[in-house]
């Protein structure tokens, strides 16, 4: 069991969330493991648009892992889970009651702060403020790690520095995300000697929305930063980025898996 936390190098668009979604989804399809994605944002969640239609009507998707829910219901998410934690009633196996299932027994998502305010009164808005809920994330990650094989944390800057550091400290692997532009890479290099996160052996550098035709390619970036390990990349892909806006990520990855399987079978038949 392990915690894998995705963080940004700086406050900029790096494709951090979409890189996490791609990696976690692929691992869920390829491996027989229980995986949980935790969103820590208090804004409109990109993770939600990757997997779930914005509706309260439940819809069934038939995948290779059986029936699973692809729509949102109003009880799921960090709001309900935080209430259970405050009342000291939260056990590891109860977390799944507050998640949304992408692939049954494979991949689940714990969404961040619920932005819907249609049915909230003033008292409820105060009780479910992002500041109060932020304090619960550290314990939720710790408890989730006792039940799931892998816990992916999408660490957002809306959490205060102390909470962020506590989550990072209990992480087995930290994926530091950066964009491909020179300014970001230069800042990484300048801070490398003084930044505890950059010096940690648990940290890997990842370039999201990667363009292999840029002069800042993975080979040059690795050399420029003096990295011992090759810098990881998640390439820009139009089909994937469109799927991320249409709750189409699960279907896209399943179709790609089937295509790969068919190609492999054709190759075997030819032999």
Task: Describe every region a protein language model picked out.
Residues 40-142:
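P-loop/Walker-type NTP enzyme "switch/lid" segment
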Residues 242-264:
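C-terminal boundary of histidine-terminating zinc-finger modules
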Residues 105-108, 146-153, 173:
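Loop/turn-to-beta-strand initiation segments
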Residues 2-51, 137:
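Walker A/P-loop phosphate-binding motif and the immediately C-terminal alpha-helix
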Residues 131-142, 189-214:
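P-loop/Walker A phosphate-binding loop and immediately adjacent motor/lid segment at beta-alpha junctions
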Residues 162-181:
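Inter-motif core of Ras-like GTPase G domains
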Residues 209-250:
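Beta-strand-loop-alpha "switch" segments that mediate conformational coupling across diverse proteins
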Residues 6-7, 38-39, 111-112, 152-154, ...:
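Conserved beta-strand segments of the P-loop GTPase G domain that flank and frequently precede/overlap
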């Amino acid at each position: 069991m392990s915690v894998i936390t995705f963080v940004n190098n700086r406050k900029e668009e790096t494709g951090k969330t979409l890189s996490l979604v791609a990696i976690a989804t692929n691992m869920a399809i390829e491996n027989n493991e229980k995986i949980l994605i935790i969103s820590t944002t208090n804004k409109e969640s990109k993770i939600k648009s990757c997997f779930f239609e914005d509706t309260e009507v439940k819809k069934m998707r038939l995948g290779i892992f059986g029936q699973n829910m692809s729509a949102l219901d109003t009880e799921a998410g960090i709001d309900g889970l935080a209430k259970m934690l405050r009342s000291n009633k939260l056990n590891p196996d109860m977390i799944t009651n507050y998640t949304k299932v992408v692939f049954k027994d494979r991949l689940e998502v714990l969404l961040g702060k619920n932005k819907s305010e249609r049915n909230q009164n003033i008292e409820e808005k105060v009780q479910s403020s992002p500041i109060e809920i932020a304090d619960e994330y550290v314990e939720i990650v710790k408890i989730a790690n006792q039940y799931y094989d892998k816990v992916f944390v999408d660490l957002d800057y809306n959490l205060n520095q102390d909470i962020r550091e506590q989550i990072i400290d209990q992480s087995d692997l930290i994926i530091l995300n950066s964009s491909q532009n020179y300014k970001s890479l230069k800042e990484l290099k300048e801070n490398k000697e003084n930044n505890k996160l950059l010096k940690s052996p648990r940290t890997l550098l990842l370039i999201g929305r990667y363009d292999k035709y840029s002069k800042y390619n993975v080979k040059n970036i690795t050399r420029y930063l003096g990295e011992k390990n090759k810098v990881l990349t998640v390439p820009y892909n139009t089909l994937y980025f469109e799927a991320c806006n249409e709750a189409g990520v699960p279907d896209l990855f399943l179709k790609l898996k089937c295509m790969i399987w068919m190609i492999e079978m054709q190759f075997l038949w030819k032999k």
